[in-house]
Amino acid sequence: MASRTPRRLLALTGVIGLALTAAACGGGTTAKDNLDKPECVAFKDYSGIAGKTVSIYASIRDTEADLLRQSWKEFENCTGAKISYEGTGEFETQINVRVDGGRAPDIAFIPQPGLIEKFVNSGKLKAASDKTKTTATANYSPDWLKYATFNGTLYGAPLGSNVKSFVWYSPKTFKDKGWKIPETWDELIALSNTIAATGTKPWCAGIESGVATGWPATDWIEDVLLRDQGPDVYDQWVTHKIPFNDPKIVSATERVGTILKNANYVNGGIGDVKSIATTSFQEGGLPVVSGKCAMHRQASFYANQWPQGTKVAEDGDVFAFYFPAIDPSKKPVLGAGEFTVTFADRPEVQAVQAYLASEHHANSRAKLGNWVSANKKLDLTNVANPIDKKSVEILQDTKTVFRFDGSDLMPSGVGAGSFWKGMTDWITGKSTKETLDFIESSWK
């Protein structure tokens, strides 16, 4: 006999069901966007993600992290989506732990193309969406996009960047002494000789950096190799298509030695050639301010190392000029930066990655200060800091041939190991041959 449910119980069940449904639908405010508002017109392509949350994990912390959160606030307000950001000083280690443990963030900002490739090869990363590809291609040069492209597929989009091809100097000292900013390598060496003849050491440097001691010297090699041999040889070198002790690399290293291992040139205000190895990166350029050294080759981010109250400007206490090319018709530039990559392909994750590749985010972040981007549509009027503005001008120059920091492209055992150690030993007395042979032998 078929069982029957009393009609009154059925009715009661229906009422309860309706009540539960109403509670589920009406118990909270339905998430909505504000894309219909005039101030949100730039975000109309990011619809359908209201109420969604996207997690981002990176190495950017403290004040810089706060500025990042401010930079995408308008995106959140207009789209109704939320970005949950976490910055850590242990990023390189912890991103591997999280990914391997199945706790990958939706998006990570990765500064090492080699690490991006590792995650691509492991199948962990998602390819960039069509929207991200279109946006990134419109806003960044192929020189940048290639560092996040593997087997013809784009996985990451550039975010922030820095320029390493700078020489810091004192505008006041140069003016008082009648020294002109050199525009070619030959002029740079001629100026160095002129300064040395006055009894002042023209150059100062420091490569001590704890467990990372040596990295500033690797930047010297990379920057000069781009000038000495050109971008094609540079590309062959970082991928080990030519050995580390190839004659072309020997040539560039010897050229660096004409400055860094020249007792008449270094180490102004600090000591002899060997003192470079024991002088911290942070202190390596400080004698420029006191006039005991004339020039210091270091990246745009060295602006943060000058003593409090130092005016960084073309008419200030310190400023920087472009590290001259050997061939004045060329403009090689060494730099680095972060790429946004995704470990999930939900629509909201794809939307955030596309937004971060846009001119809207680049300009939003630039207005907040202390930011450089290679985004071609970054408006220079939004970049207030003089050295940041000069960096953006260089990155946007159509003559610029950009190459990413070589040590970040090499296997970590080389780029963050034997290369650092080898260059430190080179500064303290080892020959170029011994040094390059040692580094080459470590490349497995």
Regions found by a protein language model. Give the residues of each.
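Extracytoplasmic/periplasmic solute-binding protein
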Residues: Y155-P158, I189-N245, V250
